[in-house]
């Protein structure tokens, strides 16, 4: 199996790489950081920032030329930081979060889509978030980026309908990763990354259009989407906020 994963140096990306690694696998691992672990099979690292579209295009061309179109591409790279939506000083953070979580995701999948479409097979998967269903105080940049990722993946799915290429949107809740370990509040239904990777892989194998992980967060997401605005505003305003002093 030929699998490409972005953000593969830690967290969910590392767990997914470990999950898919086997003596028969070929993994293209894309990250701006070094990989502090070894895997079975053929592993091809690419030191690429997903905000660098030309570099992504070169990495995709190299992988396809050497191994053929991937069976699966997972756009996982992401960043998160607390923001104040009413402060001009935080617009720079918003721009950076959107560049990675939305533009980087779109560029990753678009770099590999033509070869997969020509082959008439494969799966393009994007890691969004439960945070993309409603806006949260102090977390506007992250919520906006994930909401945009959800709708962008939906658009991509409809565009590729009938091509043989599937598009899967994964919306995790809290996963125990370096990104969430900076949070200074209790995170309900927290999953270890290895378990998250297993559940994500199952959803991808089933070609689910949209999968919320874990199931408890799926129930919460349904409630969030139907909750009246007046009630949601009261609850969300009192919710704990992500730290603003995080390097992204």
What do the predicted segments below correspond to?
Residues 9-10:
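Conserved glycine-rich cofactor-binding loop
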Residues 23-38:
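Conserved glycine-rich Rossmann-like NAD(P)H-binding loop of the short-chain dehydrogenase/reductase
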Residues 41-54:
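Rossmann-fold cofactor-recognition segment
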Residues 80-95, 138:
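Conserved mid-core segment of classical short-chain dehydrogenase/reductases
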Residues 109, 145:
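Active-site helix of classical SDR
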Residues 129:
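Residue(s) in the substrate-gating loop at a strand-loop-helix junction
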Residues 169, 185-221:
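C-terminal helical subdomain
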